[in-house]
A protein has these predicted regions:
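Conserved alpha/beta-domain cores
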Residues: 1-175
């Protein structure tokens, strides 16, 4: 989801969160307002969050790898976590985020003493990623296809409103 979906919107919500965080209402409200986006579906989401805030990728990697380590140790199930980087448009985005993921995952696995393997892949969900999939494949160990966003960005249809448009397009043999 876009970044704004994780943020409080109403003043009372901002005040409550500011109190919990031990920061001023004005400081938090200013931060929330600075993160507002006019078109969040094409804004700060997916791997863009990880590029802007690498600590998010670190935290998510720690959660995934720590859970896998616990399963190995507690249940003796030798699993291979597959960590997927979403909404990649450019191979350098994946390369950057993969480096963050690998650093954290390798650190945790070394500390555990296990010989656990993991994979880092991506979701192809932008036209740019689809067109440059050959380059992206050099960095990704697996692919998944995000057809909702890929279709939305390719055709310029809103996935929330496309139903009524597509019915007519199909009837008129446009698509």
């Amino acid at each position: 989801p876009p970044l704004h979906e994780f943020l409080p919107h109403e003043d009372d919500e901002i005040k409550e969160l500011a109190d919990e965080m031990g920061v001023s209402f004005d400081k938090l409200k200013g931060k929330v307002e600075s993160l507002h986006e006019f078109n969040p579906m094409l804004g700060t989401r997916g791997c863009r969050l990880d590029v802007l805030y690498p600590e998010i990728a670190e935290m998510q990697t720690e959660a995934i790898v720590s859970a896998a380590i616990n399963v190995w140790k507690e249940d003796d199930l030798h699993i291979t976590p597959e960590i997927m980087v979403p909404l990649v448009s450019e191979v350098n985005e994946l390369r950057f985020v993969k480096k963050v993921i690998k650093a954290k995952a390798d650190e945790l696995i070394e500390q555990s003493g296990l010989k656990m393997k993991y994979m880092v892949g991506t979701m192809i969900e932008t036209p740019r990623a689809a067109v440059t999939a050959g380059d992206v494949a050099k960095e990704a160990e697996f692919f998944s296809f995000g057809t909702n966003d890929l279709t939305q960005m390719t055709y310029g249809f809103s996935r929330d409103d496309v139903g009524r448009i597509l019915e007519t397009y199909f009837d008129k043999k446009i698509l």
